[in-house]
Amino acid sequence: MQITVNPLLQTAKPSQRPSRELAVSRGVLLSSRTNHAAKSLRQSSLAIVRQNDSTALNGDPRPRLTALRSELRALASSTRLSPNTLLMRAWRSLIELRIDEALAAVAQFEDESARADALVAARSGEFAGVLRALLLVLKSRDHATVRAALAVLESRHRSGGKSPTLTAALRIGYWKVQDFDRYYAVPRLNHAVPTHRGTHGLATIVGPTFEAVVEAEQLRLAVATRLARSAHERAVSRFGKRSPVTARAAGVLAELLYEEGHCAGLDALVMESLAAVRTSGDHESALQGYRVLTRLAARRGDTEFAFLVLKEAEVLAAARDWPEMMAESLMLRAQLLLQEGRTRDAAICIERIETLPRELSSDDALQATLAFARAQLLAATGEERRAATIFRELQAASSGKRNNYWALQISVRLADALLACGDHAEGRAILVQALQVGARAGVYQTFVEAGAQVAELLFSLHHATPQDRRLPPELRPYIESILAERAQQRARTLPARASRVTESLSPREHSVLRSMSRGLSNKRIAQELQIAPETVKSHVKGIFIKLAVQTRAHAVSTAGALGLL
């Protein structure tokens, strides 16, 4: 048989066995010798991808590896493979955390197994069912889907299945459906025991990565960061820096470090993880990476880059058919627009989310985040009481779910809305309680990125006398560090923001703003500018929206800081 070799492989050195095996794999696939091809693929291309073997090809291996993987997978997908080969492909994809590819292979197996020997199909079918359940637990956030998958895994566990992968999947599934008693009943894996084979090695990475998420939800950030860092180091050692497994751990670690205020070097960590996610990662890893990259850009005042990042996230979500990621990306865009005072554009983003597939309506976490975004929009458009009502509903719904981090974020936003409504006593009490929780946990960015009313109260608390018993003394250093970080971010973002606001304010709004700075009422401003009081009121509302403020005093102070007066 004449085998045509890919020209990319002809640049490899003769001694490089993996490249020759890749060529053989291509040839046997073209000749329909699928079992031989699968064996060659297992020995060569998958090993190269898993180990990120840069010596397998001359020069920079990444373009060649990408081209080879694309060609081989396209050939394999168009060729009828045996059921066992399909299961092996699904298993290999699971090991590398290519969830969508693994599910596709399982689905193809189920189609092919109907033509296979009945006994072989039955045995393989049981294994495929467990494999599908593992994949769905890792991928899905829908409670009904996860519960159905857990039923399969529990049956396997009762029949003697004790693998680390099964244990990790059970714990992940129980936490997702909020069955906390069963979650804690399943023993934790001993992550200190080294293991390097198959999904056992995967379990020692994905397991602690998910446990880091759980610890973060419990506001034990130090423990969470330690688990995520250990999982990331193990993933880099086992799979290399640019693999979906490493990206999962890197995304969790990056979000934890950002919340703790440790932002140095995060760009590089996130960019490495996104390089893997763009080709074969999962939507959770992608969302974590894009979320951190967006917040880092906004933190340094580079909103143009932040919007470009979100655009790439939306394009990837559309290409990979990830409606959950599309919704989350649009919510991030809406929050960024609200920070710039662009409430109309933010409202359009939220409306786009509501047109996404109906299955998202059963995603409780996504619906809660959407309600959170709607409340932020209401607060930004002067409807603080309606916003406070939504935040209270979210706070009530979060009780019993053991996600203290989410509850803390709601409390901070609720305090901001109440302060804007004039409910200073309740708003202050909620904020002080949130500060006590945040100080113990080491939370920073949640308060640094809080609304203007919270910032003003933090400033007031910081300058209160030591005799002020309403503020616990241990909170003073914590508040000081939050205000210091907020001041640094303000200094970075003010020039760009001042330019945008200056361009957006009309000449008449400038005139009204200058009159407001002199303490004039709407009636006096109307007389001075010879316009109707209703027109002044409309201009004041436009100024509030463009400056992203909620009171006249805050509008004047913000305009002064931006150099508009």
Regions found by a protein language model. Give the residues of each.
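Residue at a conserved register position within TPR or TPR-like alpha-solenoid repeats
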Residues: S93, L136, Y174-K176, E215, ...
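Structural motif corresponding to the intra-repeat A-B loop/turn of tetratricopeptide repeats
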Residues: E96, K139-S140, V177-D179, Q218, ...
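Amphipathic alpha-helical segments of tetratricopeptide repeats
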Residues: R69-A74, A107-D117, L150-S159, N190-R197, ...
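TPR-repeat structural position
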Residues: I99, D142-H143, F180-R182, L221, ...
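Alpha-solenoid helical repeat architecture
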Residues: A37-R42, S77-L86, D117-L131, R158-I172, ...
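Single-residue signature of alpha-solenoid repeat helices
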Residues: A102, V146, Y183-A185, A224, ...
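Linker/hinge segments immediately adjacent to helix-turn-helix/homeobox DNA-binding domains
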Residues: N404, I430, L435-P507, R514, ...
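Helix-turn-helix DNA-binding segment
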Residues: A491-Q550, H554-L565
